[in-house]
Design a protein with these regions (language model features):
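Disordered, acidic Ser/Thr/Pro-rich linker "stalks" and the adjacent N-terminal cap
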Residues: 57-130, 138-147, 157, 167-176
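Substrate-binding groove of N-acetylhexosamine-processing glycoside hydrolases
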Residues: 1-74, 79, 191
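Hydrophobic, well-ordered secondary-structure elements that form the walls
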Residues: 11, 133, 196
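Flexible loop residues that form catalytic
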Residues: 16, 138, 199
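Short loop segments at secondary-structure junctions
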Residues: 11, 157-159
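Short beta-strand elements bearing conserved aromatic residues within extracellular beta-rich modules
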Residues: 151-153
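Tryptophan-centered short beta-strand motifs
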Residues: 161-163
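Beta-sandwich interaction modules
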Residues: 168-199
Length: 199
């Protein structure tokens, strides 16, 4: 068992490095594929090193991230909220300080189905100096996990009238790469409510 743990998945990494052209090498993509291969090896009775416990270069995946919105109330709507199968812990998932790992299967990613818009409003409880707002998104085309094509970030003091801080358009390219993108805004604003929309 120890020899298997030393060999797998290192041999997968060796094959990836040796047989892939430099122009197509992508660690993030390899890591997600390796996680699936490790699960397949386990199912076959092998004892590979558990990559899920590896601390890679996804910052915050191994420990909570501190920010001003941690623990604040999040309202979803008016469209239906996240898909129940990918709730990532429910209504507080977006403000719990925990960042999703390398795969949507880690139960840390919140998923939204079809054309339904992600529309969340965070109540900071009082007027607050805001300098950045952002959210990470993952794309894995095989299981139809896609990036948003548009993101809008706005703020408000009354929760009714919102001022747009940033609107981002994104062309969704459907390929076999696993991709992570943070859609965010940086600047200076003062508000009680932060609204984040993605579709």
């Amino acid at each position: 068992a120890h020899a298997e743990m030393m060999i797998y998945p290192r041999i997968l990494a060796l094959a990836e490095v040796a047989w892939s052209a430099p122009s197509v090498k992508n660690y993030d993509d390899f890591h997600v594929r390796a996680l699936k291969e490790v699960e397949a090896l386990k199912a076959e009775g092998y004892h590979p090193f558990d990559l899920k416990n590896e601390i890679g270069n996804r910052p915050g995946a191994d420990q909570p991230v501190q920010h001003l919105a941690v623990g604040k109330k999040v309202a979803y709507g008016p469209d239906p909220a996240y898909y129940p199968g990918y709730s990532a812990g429910g209504d507080s998932a977006l403000v719990d300080g925990v960042i999703g790992g390398w795969t949507y299967g880690d139960r840390r990613w919140q998923g939204f189905i079809d054309k339904k818009r992600m529309d969340v409003t965070i109540d900071m409880e009082k007027e607050t100096e805001i300098h950045s707002v952002g959210a990470d998104f993952m794309q894995v085309c095989g299981p139809e996990v896609f990036m948003p094509s548009e993101v809008i970030i706005s703020v408000s003091n009354d929760g009714k009238e919102f001022t747009e801080l940033k609107r981002m358009e994104h062309k969704v390219v459907k390929d076999d790469k696993v991709t992570f993108i943070n859609f965010g805004w940086e600047g200076n604003a003062k508000a009680r409510y932060i609204r984040y929309q993605a579709s």
